[in-house]
């Protein structure tokens, strides 16, 4: 294709980056072009032209020295490359491409507010060409609106696989626009080729802006610039601060209200509501655990004197006493709430869970100690005495609430064993079989229950 283009007098810029053309008039057709018919001469390369859009903006950057940011992931250009084409065949298919070529063989650095050469340029990476996404398209499509390369990205990653344009930092480049007549990008041969470039689009590739003037131009004209967003946020913060600022009259009014007694009274209803909250009396919920002696003395588990008792494990009384006490308690009223404020100085016994004296008597029987009169048995599960000012000694704690009969050893012959014949089929004839036994050891062969257990 290159040879074919040379025969016709054209140059392929993407294949020969050292050759470029600034405008369509630089193309010199060969003498053989005179044999082309007049109809085809309307669409010769001499008739194809291009103009740069946003030329004023590009000129502002060009005067200060345009800089383009390159990153590893790729960064879009600003100003964007945007051109307009004319002179194309309305129905012919064209492809539009762009590539970047170095301006010289030097590396640059920013020194004393100006760019200066700092050595020889690095080897140029493989030439990459960006194809416009609309390619191929008819000449009417390309000439209808300006052509923008907004998705083109620049990168410094030499191993890039995303199709971005690879450039070196601190090197100067310029973009070139190629118009190729072709119906298919891959199969059909390329036809006429026209190359355009504009001096205003020259730039220096950098990883960070060096010239402050370029930074200001980017902020002022690029709404997506980071500095522009930071400036907007600062303006918003200033607006918020202005709205929060109050006039002197409002501040004085606020100070007068805080000094007035109304500010203190406004919180008073909250305190009264907290104090008036009622607390459920635990004696109502746990009536069975309140002894008769406590009810008579006006001491409930809710009182301050009984906090320690409530935290101890309560020892229930026997089932018979519990039944009698529950009936007796149901006919009585609870103690007066005025008794709850009993001073702690009148508490003469510690908060220790104790058991009735009947259990003490049973314990004495086991150890062979003579028991006290059974009439002295108390029905309360907690022994709290408030009649005498003398401090009483602690009673022993026992972990059983059963009667003394469980500890008594039965005499010989007290139980009359009853047994049944294991193989007797007539249930009506079953009866007790009397046996004479001399000791307890002979009972082990007979059942103690008058019925069979499965």
From Swiss-Prot:
It holds the Pfam family T-box. Transcription factor required for both mesoderm and endoderm formation in the embryo; signaling determinants and concentration levels may determine which germ layer is formed. Acts together with beta-catenin to activate genes that are responsible for mesoderm induction including wnt-8, eomes t/bra, siamois, mix1 and sox17. Directly binds to promoter DNA. Patterns the mesoderm along the dorsoventral and posterior axis. Activates siamois gene transcription when alone or in combination with beta-catenin, but inhibits siamois transcription in combination with pou5f1.1/oct-25. It comes from the Eukaryota. Residues 229-241 have a biased composition (Basic and acidic residues). Keywords: Activator, Developmental protein, DNA-binding, Nucleus, Transcription, Transcription regulation. It is found in: Nucleus. SUPFAM superfamilies: p53-like transcription factors (SSF49417). InterPro entries: p53-like_TF_DNA-bd_sf, T-box_DNA-bd, T-box_sf, TF_T-box, TF_T-box_CS. It comes from Xenopus borealis. Residues 229-274, 295-358 are annotated as: Disordered. One of its GO terms (biological process) is cell fate specification. Forms a repression complex on the promoters of the nodal/nr1 and siamois genes with the maternal factors tcf7l1/tcf3 and pouf5.1/oct-25. Interacts (via C-terminus) with tcf7l1/tcf3 (via N-terminus). Also interacts with the other POU-domain transcription factors pou5f1.2/oct-91 and pou5f1.3/oct-60. This is T-box protein VegT. Residues 308-325 have a biased composition (Polar residues). Residues 57-230 bind DNA. PROSITE patterns: TBOX_1 (PS01283), TBOX_2 (PS01264), TBOX_3 (PS50252). Disulfide bonds: none annotated. GO terms for cellular component: chromatin; nucleus. GO terms for molecular function: DNA-binding transcription factor activity, RNA polymerase II-specific; RNA polymerase II cis-regulatory region sequence-specific DNA binding.
